Design a protein with these regions (language model features):
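Glycine-rich phosphate-binding loops of nucleotide-dependent enzymes
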Residues: 2-247
Length: 247
């Protein structure tokens, strides 16, 4: 069974068709890239999948169930995680406390700041930090982290909910080449360990063709290519429209 099934999704803003009849599926464990220039509809498509937007036509199925009635929070609890181009963390809390809060939220429970001093989730939070290579920064304020480490922290926050599907919006934006490859190697390793599917947007073609097992290409809201990286790289329309663009 497909983990994610997107069927003929449509979403317009005024007269602009941001997502225009997009259909595709993802299997558990797949690592796929969604590419296209700014304005192609990538973020809108992610917002339709995670519940921040409602489609005007079409539907999204997750593990065979329609997501129509699910809020964004419910989709997170059911196994759809997301990271953003601009990392969303609590800057004034420690790295460990950030993950403790994420673990509590995954359980549908609120924590006060005082609770973090004794909360039993500290051990689980430490384990997540070890998975993303941040255990040595556990007691540091999130605001003190280097940019690449902030992206790792956001990944740990997303993993706290044990997602079966992780949507990643430009995970390596702003990183040097070595940082990009290190982060993507970590993501692929973590996905393989849990059979988690990953769908990521990315402008760096070295990342796309170095790590995606499948590439989907959007143009003006339409899916114009979908296949293994070698086939997409050889597609003449994709070459003409996108592969020379890095912004």
């Amino acid at each position: 069974m497909n983990l994610l099934q997107v069927e003929r999704l449509h979403r317009s803003f005024g007269g602009v068709r941001a997502v225009d009849g997009v259909s595709f599926t993802l299997m558990a464990g797949e690592i796929a890239a969604l590419i296209g220039p700014n304005g192609a509809g990538k973020s809108t498509l992610f917002n339709l999948i995670d519940g921040q937007l409602t489609p005007q036509a079409g539907r999204v199925l997750f593990n065979g169930e329609s997501l129509t009635a699910w809020s964004t929070a419910e989709r997170t609890r059911r196994g759809i995680g997301r990271t953003f181009q601009v990392a969303q963390t609590f800057a004034t809390l420690t790295v460990l406390q950030n993950v403790q809060l994420a673990l509590a939220a995954a359980e549908g429970r609120a924590l006060g700041i005082a609770d973090l001093l004794w909360d039993l989730r500290a051990e689980a939070a430490s384990s997540l930090l070890a998975q993303v290579g941040l255990q040595q920064h556990a007691s540091d304020a999130a605001a003190s982290l280097a940019y690449g480490d902030i992206k790792r922290l956001e990944l740990a926050l997303a993993l706290a909910a044990k997602p079966r599907l992780l949507l990643m919006d430009e995970p390596t934006a702003g990183m040097a080449a070595a940082e990009r490859f290190a982060l993507m190697q970590m993501i692929v390793r973590l996905a393989g360990a849990s059979n988690m599917a990953v769908l990521f947007t990315e402008h760096s073609m070295d990342v796309v063709f170095g790590f995606a097992r499948r590439v989907l290409v959007l143009s003006r809201g339409r899916l114009i290519a979908d296949g293994v990286p070698e086939a997409v790289r050889a597609d003449t329309e994709v070459q003409r429209l996108y592969l020379g663009e890095e912004a």
